[in-house]
Amino acid sequence: MKPLKILISNDDGVFAEGIRTLATSAASRGHKVTVVCPDQERSATGHGLTLHSPIRAEKADELFGGGIKAWGCSGTPADCVKLALNELLDQKPDLILSGINHGPNLGTDIFCSGTVAAALEGTLDGIPSIAVSVASFQWKNFSFAGKLSLDIAEKAIQQNWPKNLLLNLNIPPCEEKEMGDLVWTRLSIRQYEEQFIRRVDPRGNTYFWMAGEAVKDLQSAGEGPKGWPSDVSQIALCSPSLTPIQPDLFWRGNLDDLPNLI
């Protein structure tokens, strides 16, 4: 296939190993790669935008090499993609990749994900986009995730990419030889036991750390193929999960069940 113009972003920041692996993987296949991502950790910022302070962008080519153009930006992941598409890029990209995230983006956690938000900006602009995550905060080998991401992207881009389709890829933290097959999955509904740790600073002011953990994963959110496993259950089986999602959040339940409000 002819080389693609690929924009890559993330929410872990310009120094993260995941984004460097993804950019290098794409460039090694002959694609024209541009990285525009936060200049620091911006995890769990969701689709937030910077509206009350300037966004600064500094060149960061030296962090990547291999002909990859890169910027580190002071804004959120969504800011980065907006800035890239409207100011930094000479041409519209053929593909947007977001990641490789250091940690999972499964189920309804995607609403908090800066990784998914960056990819969603591409989807909203009509650009084929994929969010990529390794489902562990400790796993540091991103080479297979980079390879699989590009395999999927190249295969999908040669087909008729449906309008409003965003692909969310999660890869289990295990060696390639131990993995099961890649399958289509549904989004789980993740329920958490929220915890806040209360502390007092040296000046006597109270502050909090948010903690908590997932205590329940319901099989699926919304409508969809009943035979598909959930993304959480697929990762638990040490198999990659590929979930099709879209920006349209319109409720698809029975309209007769809506409250009588109008």
From Swiss-Prot:
The gene is surE. Belongs to the SurE nucleotidase family. It comes from Prochlorococcus marinus (strain NATL2A). It is found in: Cytoplasm. Its cofactor is a divalent metal cation. A divalent metal cation binds at D11, D12, S43, N101. Its EC number is 3.1.3.5. SUPFAM superfamilies: SurE-like. It comes from the Bacteria. It catalyses: a ribonucleoside 5'-phosphate + H2O = a ribonucleoside + phosphate. This is 5'-nucleotidase SurE. Gene3D superfamilies: Survival protein SurE-like phosphatase/nucleotidase. The keyword DNA damage does not apply. Keywords: Cytoplasm, Hydrolase, Metal-binding, Nucleotide-binding. GO terms for cellular component: cytoplasm. Binds 1 divalent metal cation per subunit. Its main location: cytoplasm. One of its GO terms (molecular function) is 3'-nucleotidase activity.
